[in-house]
UniProtKB/Swiss-Prot annotation:
Pfam families in alphabetical order: TACO1_YebC_N (PF20772), Transcrip_reg (PF01709)
Matching Gene3D superfamilies: 1.10.10.200, 3.30.70.980
Disulfide bonds: none
Gene Ontology terms describing biological process: regulation of DNA-templated transcription
Protein name: Probable transcriptional regulatory protein Fphi_1565
Gene Ontology annotations for the cellular component aspect, listed alphabetically: cytosol
InterPro entries cross-referenced by the UniProt entry: Integrase-like_N (IPR017856), TACO1_YebC-like_2nd/3rd_dom (IPR048300), TACO1_YebC_N (IPR049083), Transcrip_reg_TACO1-like (IPR002876), Transcrip_reg_TACO1-like_dom3 (IPR026564), YebC-like (IPR029072)
The keyword Transcription is annotated on this UniProt entry: yes
Xref: HAMAP family: Transcrip_reg_TACO1
Record keywords: Cytoplasm, DNA-binding, Transcription, Transcription regulation
Length: 248
């Protein structure tokens, strides 16, 4: 199935992440630690931990760092004071935004998130105000040049839900959150190393924006992602390749 890449924003985000590797690693370690605390340190019995580990490895985190984070979480440590919170709101142009956080101080976090929304021309909403527009799923992305038929065979056999080949030759493999790690591990075992892999929220209907509003939305996303307590930010914007090129 061919189409325009719905995931062009991943390449933009990846470039930013390379420049902020330390902060990204901090967020990944926090996710691994909390996942291990909540579900135990055995990744085979803890799907969330397996997904967190897969994402960490996709971002080139070392095995030693991952193992230390697991031990920290499974042993209790100070991660017990951290809780997960989710905020929903609207950005410029009325776009839907979901912000996942991990915090030891809800009041601090909600204040910072609200300030980011307000500063960027958006507003923080109530629980459930936009979440219904999204579906949680895994996505494993490959740069152009991979063997599409071989990749498809491995992915589908491992439990992938859908595979999309884009006009530039890049490929996205979609999974349920539960099957994400199984599919990624099966692909790696067969020599298919992804360009990006994550469990994300995908909007059922995408918002089409002009460049002016898109720039304002990206500024909001950047503000939110720069907050220490923020783990992930999701939007329903259709970041097409053309739009991302205009955004630079």
């Amino acid at each position: 199935m061919a189409g325009h890449s719905k995931w062009a924003n991943i390449k933009h985000k990846k470039a930013k992440e390379d420049a902020k590797r330390g902060k990204i690693f901090t967020k990944l370690i926090r996710e691994i630690t909390v996942a291990a605390r909540l579900g135990g340190g055995d990744k085979d019995a803890n799907p969330r931990l397996r997904a967190a580990i897969a994402t960490a490895f996709a971002n080139n985190m070392s095995k030693d760092t991952v193992e230390r984070a697991i031990l920290k979480g499974a042993g209790g440590d100070d991660s017990a004071n951290v809780e997960e919170v989710r905020y929903e709101g609207y950005g410029p142009g009325g776009v839907a935004i979901i912000v996942d956080c991990m915090t030891d101080n809800r009041n601090r976090t909600v204040g910072e998130v609200r300030h980011a929304f307000t500063k960027s021309g958006g507003n923080l909403g109530t629980d459930g105000s936009v979440a219904y527009m999204f579906t949680k799923k895994g996505i494993i992305s490959f740069a152009p040049g991979v063997d599409e038929d071989a990749l498809m065979e491995v992915a589908l056999e491992a439990g992938a839900e859908d595979i999309i080949t884009h006009e530039d030759g890049s490929i996205d493999v979609f999974t349920t959150p539960h099957d994400f790690s199984d599919v990624q591990e099966a692909l790696i075992a067969k020599g298919f190393n992804s360009d990006n892999a994550e469990v994300t929220f995908d909007a059922e209907t995408k918002a089409e924006l002009d460049i002016e509003i898109a720039e304002k939305v990206m500024n909001l996303i950047d503000r939110l992602e720069d907050l220490d307590d923020v783990q992930n930010v999701y939007s329903n914007v259709n970041f097409t390749q053309e739009l991302m090129e205009q955004l630079g």
